[in-house]
Each structure stands twice: as structure tokens, then as C-alpha cells.
Amino acid sequence: MHYKKAFLASLLSSIALTAYAPPEPWATLTPSSKMDGGTTEYRTSFGLAVIPFTVTESKVKRNVISQINDGQVQVTTQKLPHPVSQIGDGQIQVTTQKVPPVVSHIVSQIGDGQLQITTAKNVVTKSTIAVPSKTVTATATSTATAVSQIHDGQVQVTISSASSSSVLSKSKLEPTKKPNNEKVIKVQACKSSGTLAITLQGGVLIDSSGRIGSIVANRQFQFDGPPPQAGAIYAGGWSITKHGTLAIGDNDVFYQCLSGTFYNLYDQSIGGQCNPVHLQTVGLVDC
């Protein structure tokens, strides 16, 4: 009887060990602190819009992030509504160009996962966006371009002009109607080819190609892997604040730093051509 009980105990223990799936090693690359009241689960795809600290209640610059194929995140230099795009490598970028004061750049992504933001004129409806210590009213005069992504994963927002006769119902940013925790996302933007689309799962950001959002060794925000790029500083610990902005740990301030015709996004300032921004989460809709 004693041996039978010992055998059963051993069997149950082995079953428990088999069922246990330890977290990926990179998932432990998180900041030591967390955002108070932050949401770490958001399974519906959403995008990002760059909001510089120069916003006023009458003028809003929302650069929607784009992503190129390598996963990098970039933002272009133009003052107009634009969703962030992503190029193939996962990088996120924002392009540079001067335009009217009311802006919204949607982050796009290129094939490598980099994130970029380019400049395009877009029309948005008047909506209210809550940002820490201030409420911003958007009254943009152009159509919102959704975040795009190229093969390397970089995130970009492409440069394109939109006619002033654009139909609002087809291209706009507007308050979203979401149940429960999805209420944290305040606005919507039109989704287009290359638009950066991400989900938040247990504090981990995942793009539409399954790559992991991380802060890499040079402090840049981009998508790679899995696993994330070697030497990555953070690969977990992401959340959406109660104001609807993206945060890593207890920090929701990022920096867009000029790199040629694009801005790359970082979690820290890396030089003189860097400006602090918030990354506003936006719901993505087909227009």
C-alpha cells in the first residue's frame, strides 16, 4: 500500500511538471516597476499614434506609427494626422516634413519590424484624448492614415496628400466604443496596407507577424523574433495606461529622434535631435 501511494504521488508530480510550461527566458526582461492601473491584456489589434509634448487643447500632432519589415519603429517629420507604419524588420519610424499644425501620424511597420512615421494629410473628427495631466481636443483637418508595415518589421508612416474633400466616414479618428478594459483605447483610425497592428498579451507586445515588441540595446523600440534581438533590454512589462497611452514599466514617455527623413522611437533621449512624445493607442478599422 505504501509503495502504491508513493507511485501515485510520483505519477501526479510528473504529470504536473509535464503540464507546466515555463515562460520564455526573454519574458523576464521587464522593468522593475509597473504602471499604476495599467492594462496588460488587450487581444484586439490596435495601432499607435505619436503625440508630441507640444500639444495644446486646440492643436494636436498625432503621428501614427508605422513599421518596416525589420521591426523598427519610425515617425516622419510632418505636422499632420498619420497612423504609425511598420517596415519588414520591425523598426518604427516617423518621417520628416512640415505641414499644418493639427497632426496625427499613425505608426507603420516595415518588413524588418522597425517602426516609422511618415507624413500625410488626413481628416479626423473632433475627439477628446486624455493624456496625463491634460485633456487634448483633436480638430484635425485631414484624413487619418493607418499604420503600415513593410517586410523587415520597421514601423513607418508614409508621405501622401489627401484631398480636402475626403469623406469623414471613410477616414477618421473617432472615440471608440469598447466594453470593459477595451475602453482604454480612446480613438480609432483607418487601417491600410503596412499599418502597424499589435496586441498586448500578458505585458508582451506582439505584432501581426508574431514578433515581440522590445527595447533593444541602443534603446530603440522595435519588433523582432521571437526571441527578441540579442542584447534586448526589455521584452515584457508593456501596458496601456488609463489615459490610453502605451507604457513600458511605469514610463509612458518615449522619444522620437531624427534619423534622416524619419524619426526612430526610443524609451530614452539619445541626443539633441530627440523630442518627448506619448504613444497613443488607436483602434484600427477597415475604411
UniProtKB/Swiss-Prot annotation:
Keywords: Cell wall, Cleavage on pair of basic residues, Repeat, Secreted, Signal. GO terms for cellular component: extracellular region; fungal-type cell wall; fungal-type vacuole. Transmembrane segments: none annotated. The keyword Signal applies. The record marks Q72, Q91, Q114, Q154 as: Covalent attachment to cell wall glycan. InterPro entries: PIR1-like_C, Yeast_CWMannoprotein_PIR, Yeast_PIR_rpt. The record marks R62, N63 as: Cleavage. It comes from the Eukaryota. Residues 1-21 form the signal peptide. Its main location: secreted. GO terms for biological process: fungal-type cell wall organization. PIR1/2/3 repeats lie at residues 62-80, 81-99, 104-122, 144-162. Induction: Cell cycle-regulated. Expression peaks during mitosis. Residues 22-62 form a propeptide. The keyword Repeat applies. Covalently linked to beta-1,3-glucan of the inner cell wall layer via an alkali-sensitive ester linkage between the gamma-carboxyl group of glutamic acids, arising from specific glutamines within the PIR1/2/3 repeats, and hydroxyl groups of glucoses of beta-1,3-glucan chains. It is found in: Secreted, Cell wall. GO terms for molecular function: structural constituent of cell wall. The PIR1/2/3 repeats are required for the covalent linkage to the cell wall. Their number varies among different strains of S.cerevisiae. PANTHER family: CELL WALL MANNOPROTEIN CIS3-RELATED. Component of the outer cell wall layer. May be involved in meiosis and sporulation. Belongs to the PIR protein family. This is Cell wall protein PIR5. The lineage of its organism: Eukaryota, Fungi, Dikarya, Ascomycota, Saccharomycotina.
